[in-house]
Regions:
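Membrane-embedded transmembrane alpha-helical bundles that form the catalytic cores
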Residues: 1-213
Length: 213
C-alpha cells in the first residue's frame, strides 16, 4: 500500500485518523495499541505471509533491549549489544545477499547449488537499522525508562515512516506520542498535515513519476 494509492489516501488514512482520536479518549495507552495494529495491517497488506518477520524482529530486539538496560555489568552489556547487532545484520544479509553468496560459491567451486530466491521483505533495511539504533541508545544509557512492548512496537512499525524512514531516535519519537495535546484534534495541525501530504503527492505524482518516463 503506497502513500499515493487511493486505498491509502481515501480509505486507510481517514479511518486510522478518526479511530486514533477515538482511541486516545478511550484509555491511556489505547492510541498506542491502535497504531500498532494499524501498522501491522499496513505491513501485511504488502505480503501477509512475510509479516511475521517484522513481528519476530520486534519481539527479539525488545528482549535484547531489556537485557541491555537491566544488566549493570558493562562488559556483559557490550557482549549482549554485539550479539544483538550481529543477529540483526545477519537477518538483513540473509534476505539481501543469500543468492549473491550462492552464485559466487557455484562459480568458484563449480557446483550447482539452488538459489533461495527469497523475497525481499518490505522495509527490512529500515526497521533493522532503526532497532539497532535503539539497542545502541539502550547501551549508552540514553533510554533508561522501562519500555512497554506496545511502545517499542509502535517505534518500529509506525506506518508513516515504515517505507521511507527516516530513522529516528526512540526518545524523540515517543515523546511526541506521550504529549497529550498531540492526541487531541487540532485544526491547525490537521491543515498543516494536509498541506504536507498534498505537497508530497505533487512531488511524487506530477514531478517524480513524469521525470522517470
Amino acid at each position: 500500500m503506497l502513500f499515493h494509492n487511493p486505498v491509502f489516501l481515501f480509505i486507510f488514512l481517514p479511518i486510522v485518523l478518526l479511530l486514533y482520536y477515538y482511541a486516545s479518549k478511550y484509555s491511556k495507552f489505547a492510541h498506542e495499541y491502535f497504531l500498532v495494529i494499524a501498522g501491522f495491517f499496513f505491513y501485511a497488506w504488502w505480503n501477509i505471509y512475510l509479516s511475521p518477520l517484522i513481528i519476530i524482529s520486534i519481539i527479539v530486539n525488545f528482549y535484547f533491549g531489556n537485557l541491555i538496560k537491566n544488566n549493570l555489568e558493562k562488559n556483559s552489556k557490550k557482549i549482549i549489544l554485539m550479539i544483538s547487532i550481529f543477529l540483526n545484520i545477519l537477518f538483513l544479509a540473509i534476505f539481501k545477499y543469500a543468492d549473491f553468496v550462492i552464485e559466487n560459491i557455484n562459480y568458484l567451486f563449480n557446483v550447482n547449488l539452488d538459489l533461495l530466491n527469497l523475497p525481499f521483505p518490505l522495509a527490512i533495511s529500515f526497521f533493522t537499522f532503526q532497532t539497532i539504533a535503539y539497542l545502541v541508545d539502550c547501551y549508552n544509557g540514553i533510554i533508561e525508562k522501562k519500555t512497554r512492548l506496545s511502545q517499542f512496537s509502535l517505534f518500529v512499525i509506525f506506518f508513516p515512516q515504515l517505507i521511507a524512514g527516516p530513522i529516528v531516535k526512540y526518545n524523540h519519537m515517543m515523546a511526541q506520542f506521550d504529549e497529550k495535546n498531540n492526541r487531541l484534534i487540532n485544526q491547525q495541525n490537521f491543515y498543516l498535515g494536509l498541506v504536507i501530504i498534498l505537497i508530497g503527492l505533487f512531488k511524487k505524482v506530477i514531478l517524480a513519476d513524469n521525470l522517470t518516463l
